Structures are given as C-alpha cells and as structure tokens.
C-alpha cells in the first residue's frame, strides 16, 4: 500500500502535504468543521433573544433571517470557486475570518452603548463568506479514496450533530448564566483559533498534480472568482442538471417543514422553548449516528443508485405518516426515517455531483450544493408560512409525498449513471 501511495504524493508541491499527513489533515478538518458549526448554532440560539431585546418585531426578524439566507445563497458558488482557485488553506482561513467578523459584530450589537439594530443587520454581511462545511467537504473529497468517499463525507454528519447539540446547549446556558454577549465573544475566540489552525496546518492545496497542470501559466490571464458563466457551466454538464434537480426537489418539502418548525413546535406541538431544544438535540443525535455510522456501512454494500432510491422511498413513507400525525410523540417516531432520508440523499447526491466534474471544480460544485439550504431558508418562510396558515401541518406531508413520488418515477424510468472516479 505504501508503494502505491507514494506516486500519488510525488506530484504535490512541498507546501501541500508537508504541514501534516493526509489522515491528520482530514482529522483536523473534521475538528474545524465541528468548531465552526458549534459556533454557528450558538449564534442561532442567541439571535432571537437579541432581536427581541433590541425591539425587532417578527417581520423585522424575518427580514434579518432572509438577509442571511440570500447572502449565503449568493456567496456559496463564488466561495467554492475561490476554494478551487486559491486552495483549501485560503478557503478555510477566509471562512473563519468571516465568522470572526460576524461574532464580533454580534457582540457589539448586544452593547447598550452602540446602535444595536444596525450592527445586528451588519453582522449578517460576513455570512456570504461563511462556508466552512463546503470547504471541509472539498478537502475530504480531494484527500479520500473514491471507495471511502461516501463514508468520509458522511462522517461530517458527526460534526453537524456535535454543532447542533453543543451549540444549542452552550448558547442557551451561557445566555442564562452570563448574558447575550458571552456566547458571541466565546464564538469569536473559537473562530480566531480556527483561522490560525487553518492558516498554519492546512495544506495550501489538496488538489492532485494533474489539476495543477491545468492551471494558467505565470503571467497569463487568471480566471475570475466571480466568473458566473464558468460557475453556471457546471450545471450544464452531462447528468448534472438531473442530479441537482433531484437534490433540490427532494429537499424542498422537508426544508419547508424545518423552516417552519419553530412555529409548529409552539402552535401545533405546544412545546416550551426548552422542550423544543431537547427535540432538536434528539434530531442532531440521530443525524450524528446516521451520517457517521449508518451511511458508511450502507455505502460499502449498496450502490449510490440504490441508496438514492431508498432515501426517496422513505421520504414518501414519512410524508404519508406526517400527513396523519397529531402529537409530538408521533413526530418523534417519524424523525429517524426523516433523518435517514435527508442524510442519505445529501451525501449520495453530493458524491454523484463531485464525480460528474473535474477535480479542479470540486469546490465550486460543493458550493453550488451548499446553496440549496440557503435557497430553502430564503423562500421557506414565505412559502411555508402560506401553506401552514392555509392548510395546517398535514400539507407538508402531502407535498412531501407528491414531490418525492414524481422523483421516484423519474429515477425508475431513467437510472442515474454509475461513474468511475476521476483520475487524480
């Protein structure tokens, strides 16, 4: 194995893998992703309280959330292209520095001596560059073997689960004990440490030698990070539009439900804030287990096509049950199936889309994939609110069944192609 691995590293420049070994870089990437996600969910737990303290009503808070979603939606593909051109080190460092700016502005907004409302809205601006998870996915994609990739990407779900659980618990506990400003300051310190570790320990690039051969010559024209035509051209590659459409369509019903979940938990389930937090922690724990353990085992026994069809089929079953649920206990019974479908769909479609593009474009494609959730967070409050107000909770189950039945028929009529991984 060592002899086979040696040629793979010979083409790399000294600044690439010399800082840490391959496995150490992957492990550090997991730690950095978990740190950033923990800070992000700490921020999610304090922003509603801060906005209420500053006198914002529900409409203004909706504008605040929409602003963050739009900025992440627009910034995702551009950040991915930046990661492809400038490398993993620059991408992760930039993401952590943007997060640092956000948390510093958030801490300043909680100060009575400063214009809190303006600073709160200004704190949303760095969100355009906060894309640590896609950058981590790019590093793991570049450094993991093709057969190990679904499991390696799935283990990022452990990081997400850690972020949901620790971030929610730390945010609420610190706000109660030390005030709103404390979580923001702690998150700023953690992201500063993340920026330092990214700059000093992550390789300048994780791409293979063949990718470098495609780079522009010194003194020649360099492709722009903001070249939207180059970004959009990836969506016109063979099979990419269909895979991407499946990803967006199947995510849409669940995304609408999760955007409205805070309201549904209060109005429909009659939960207190602490109880809703416990339910989200349960959701995060299941996601950790599913992405960290279950998907890795399944991917070693079944093809991506089979797993994709299975996730859509489980979505349909969950949608049917969701249309009839009447209590939080019923929802808890549905959560394992919902989490399995959501995690499997995202991991498998991400893996398929990565295989469909060249190694020099993996970051851009992952940035496009990362824009799906901001898109749902942007449109979700309006569309989900209209559906909930007009038809109630069962409508989310009906929409889930209808859309995923169509997706399953498409997958059955024209199976996804089985691609071999690109030569590095």
Curated annotation (Swiss-Prot):
It comes from the Eukaryota. The chain crosses the membrane at residues 26-46, 59-79, 90-110, 156-176, 184-204, 243-263, 276-296, 312-332, 334-354, 391-411. One of its GO terms (molecular function) is xenobiotic transmembrane transporter activity. Coiled coil: none annotated. Pfam families: MFS_1. Changing residue 86 to C: In a rhabdomyosarcoma sample. Gene3D superfamilies: MFS general substrate transporter like domains (1.20.1250.20). Keywords: Cell membrane, Disease variant, Membrane, Transmembrane, Transmembrane helix. One of its GO terms (biological process) is organic cation transport. It is found in: Apical cell membrane. Expressed at high levels in adult and fetal kidney and liver, and adult colon. Expressed in fetal renal proximal tubules (at protein level). Expressed at lower levels in heart, brain and lung. PANTHER family: SOLUTE CARRIER FAMILY 22 MEMBER 18. Belongs to the major facilitator (TC 2.A.1) superfamily. Organic cation transporter (TC 2.A.1.19) family. It is linked to Lung cancer: A common malignancy affecting tissues of the lung. The most common form of lung cancer is non-small cell lung cancer (NSCLC) that can be divided into 3 major histologic subtypes: squamous cell carcinoma, adenocarcinoma, and large cell lung cancer. NSCLC is often diagnosed at an advanced stage and has a poor prognosis. Interacts with RNF167. This is Solute carrier family 67 member A1. It comes from Homo sapiens (Human).
């Amino acid at each position: 194995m060592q002899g086979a691995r040696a040629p793979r590293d010979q083409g790399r420049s000294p600044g690439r893998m010399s800082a840490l070994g391959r496995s150490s870089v992957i492990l550090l990437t997991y730690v950095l992703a978990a740190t950033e996600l923990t800070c992000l969910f700490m921020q999610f737990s304090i922003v509603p309280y801060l906005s209420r303290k500053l006198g914002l009503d529900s409409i203004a808070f909706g504008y605040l959330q929409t602003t963050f979603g739009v900025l992440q939606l627009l910034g995702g593909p551009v950040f991915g292209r930046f990661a492809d051109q400038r490398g993993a080190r620059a991408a992760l460092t930039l993401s952590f520095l943007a997060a640092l700016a956000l948390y510093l502005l958030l801490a300043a907004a909680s100060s009575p001596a400063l214009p809190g409302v303006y600073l709160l809205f200004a704190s949303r601006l760095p969100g355009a560059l906060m894309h640590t998870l896609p950058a981590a996915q790019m590093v793991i994609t570049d450094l993991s073997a093709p057969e190990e990739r679904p499991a390696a990407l799935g283990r990022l779900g452990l990081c997400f689960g850690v972020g949901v659980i620790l971030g929610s618990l730390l945010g609420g506990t610190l706000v109660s004990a030390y005030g709103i400003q404390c979580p923001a300051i702690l998150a700023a310190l953690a992201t500063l440490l993340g920026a330092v570790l990214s700059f000093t320990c992550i390789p300048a690039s994780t791409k293979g030698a063949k990718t470098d051969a495609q780079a522009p010559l010194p003194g020649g024209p360099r492709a722009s990070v903001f070249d939207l035509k180059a970004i959009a051209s990836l969506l016109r590659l063979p099979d990419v539009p269909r895979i991407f459409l499946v990803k967006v369509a199947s995510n849409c019903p669940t995304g609408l439900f999760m955007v409205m979940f805070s309201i549904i938990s209060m109005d429909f389930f009659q939960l207190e804030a602490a109880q809703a937090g416990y339910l989200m922690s349960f959701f995060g724990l299941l996601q950790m287990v599913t992405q960290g353990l279950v998907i890795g085992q399944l991917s070693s026994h079944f093809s991506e096509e089979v797993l994709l069809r299975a996730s859509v089929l489980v979505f349909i079953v969950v949608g049917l049950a969701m249309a009839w649920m009447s209590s939080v206990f019923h929802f808890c019974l549905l959560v394992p199936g919902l989490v399995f479908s959501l995690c499997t769909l995202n991991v498998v479609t991400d893996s398929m889309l990565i295989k469909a593009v060249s190694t020099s474009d993996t970051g851009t494609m992952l940035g496009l994939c990362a824009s799906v959730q901001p898109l749902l967070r942007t449109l979700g409050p309006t569309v989900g609110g209209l559906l909930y107000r007009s038809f109630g909770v069962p409508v989310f189950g009906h929409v889930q069944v209808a859309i995923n039945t169509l997706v399953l028929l498409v997958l059955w009529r024209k199976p996804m192609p089985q691609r071999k991984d690109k030569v590095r």
